[in-house]
Amino acid sequence: MKNSALVVIDLQNDITKNYKEIIAKVNEAIDWAEQKELWIVYIQHNNLSAGTRTFKPGTRGAELVPELNVVSDHIFTKVKSNALTSEAFTAFIQEHGISEFYVVGADAAACIKSTCYNMTKSGYTVHVLSDCITSYD
């Protein structure tokens, strides 16, 4: 299944505290992806807006949450909600011929939604693991 990837989106310290409700399931999904030999990638959001208080590059808030099982060094950053706007991530997809994605993380109403929409629009097969996503209240 090397043409498939598990994509873990924005499970960072500045994300909603609701991530704690899904972190065990996300880690189970990571274990499953390892067993199936899927690529496992992590997407981090960087907020470059002036005066921002969250997801500032180089801060604790921008770091992946400590409970997250990080099993690869395939960590990509984005500055917009759609993960495909990360040039490094899209280059990785193309380099490895990835065409199918399993998506987990946050925020369901923003980055998950935007990424899945744009992946589908780009012709990729997308699966959202519904027990592995969260949103703000």
Which residues does each predicted region cover?
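Conserved protein kinase catalytic core
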Residues: 16, 50, 137
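A short alpha/beta connector and helix-capping loop motif
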Residues: 19-33, 37-45
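Active-site-adjacent betaalpha module
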Residues: 1-5, 28-36, 53-137
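Active-site loop/turn elements of alpha/beta-hydrolase fold enzymes
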Residues: 11, 45-47, 131
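Glycine-rich, small/polar surface segments that engage phosphate groups of diverse ligands
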Residues: 45, 50, 59
